A protein has these predicted regions:
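Radical SAM enzyme core and accessory elements
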Residues: 22-23, 60, 259-265, 269-336
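Short aromatic-enriched loop/helix-cap "lid" or pocket-rim segments at secondary-structure transitions
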Residues: 30-31, 40, 133, 161-162, ...
Length: 336
């Protein structure tokens, strides 16, 4: 891009460039989807102040087992069509994996170079390909580092083999799995977000993960277009009774490029009739039962506090293992 500007070349030929014309944006030259992920080079982490990154300590998983974390992705793409998500738009709908050797080369080199103490896999669908995941787990077991899946995995992949899959993950060092449940109301899962997830598979999946010896964190989203206040309360109750060790209740964010984003514009669902800056903590669209974005944000804040303090009541030892000995309600909320 810089060379094109300096040399006065045609920038429209640069893949992925968005050029603004008037008040609208046009994607002039869509980038090609990388099919063979083994062609991707090792991320040049030596160009980053990794010690500064470790000192800040704001890793994807809020409570890590080490202060020297390596975030890594093994795959790209997602075959699902959830209406709130943009992963298929960014990475395509075909799920592709790097080879186990390619992944392990990155891990081993970075463990050596940066004295890594924990791995966090940021894949959208890490459990999507069980064969590849099991191959990876065999190698991770040799490395002996703790790891987790903070980006969330689909709940009902490989149900018949799920317990064995989770046991293999735990044996390879996975101390916590995050499950992307989103809602406990089947109407929302089917008709609003197209999740392709039977709600009655959520509890068994959580139970399988706990039987395998992993902590379970769950993701839930509230404030979908058309979701009623009563349905939100049903999801909260469903989550509280799920057996999950910890929770994140998020405010629906209408991500640009997602079907819900287009729905919000089409039906003018913004609180103030216009799109606002997204930071994943603010409420942008109208929500049933609430008169202002601030009121809904307070509701989500309080729900997260109640949800995550459940673990302290049920299992103080697990709570200390996850959050430490001196966590307060306010500091807990900064991490949810």
């Amino acid at each position: 891009f810089v060379n094109s500007i300096v040399n006065n070349n045609d920038v429209s030929k640069i893949p992925g460039l968005i050029k603004k014309i008037g008040e609208k944006k046009y994607l002039i030259n869509p980038p090609e989807i990388v099919k063979d992920l083994n062609v991707l080079p090792r991320p040049p982490r030596h160009l980053v102040n990794m010690e500064g990154y470790f000192d800040i300590g704001q890793f994807h998983s809020s409570k890590s087992r080490s202060n020297r974390v390596l975030n890594i992705m093994c795959s790209r793409g997602c075959p699902e069509k959830c209406t709130f998500c943009t992963t298929p738009e960014v990475y395509g709908q075909t799920h592709r994996w790097r080879s186990t050797a390619h992944i392990m080369e990155e891990i081993k080199n970075d463990v050596r170079d940066f004295k890594i103490g924990e791995l966090q896999f940021d894949d959208d669908t890490l459990t999507g390909n069980r064969k590849n995941l099991m191959s990876l787990c065999k190698e991770l077991e040799k490395v002996g580092l703790p790891w987790c899946t903070p980006n969330g995995t689909k709940v009902n992949y490989h149900l018949k083999h799920q317990l064995d899959m989770y046991k293999s993950m735990a044996a390879a060092g996975c101390y916590q799995i995050t499950l992307a449940c989103e809602s406990g109301v089947q109407r929302i899962l089917d008709d609003v977000i197209n999740k392709r997830l039977p709600a009655d598979t959520i509890y068994p999946s959580i139970e399988n993960a706990k039987k395998a010896g992993m902590l379970v964190h769950t993701f839930w989203i509230l404030g979908f277009p058309g979701e009623t206040y009563e349905e939100m309360q049903r999801t909260i109750k469903f989550a509280f009774n799920s057996g999950s060790d910890s929770f994140t209740f998020s405010i629906l964010q209408p991500l640009a490029g997602s079907p819900i984003y287009r729905q919000v514009w089409r039906n003018n669902l913004w609180w103030d009739a216009k799109e606002s800056y997204q930071n994943f903590r603010n409420s942008l669209i109208k929500v049933d039962g609430f008169s202002s974005p601030e009121e809904f944000e307070r509701f989500i804040h309080e729900t997260n506090i109640k949800a995550n303090l459940l673990l302290k009541e049920k299992d103080p030892d697990k709570f200390r293992l996850k959050y430490g000995d001196r966590v307060s309600q306010s500091s807990l909320m900064k991490q949810t």
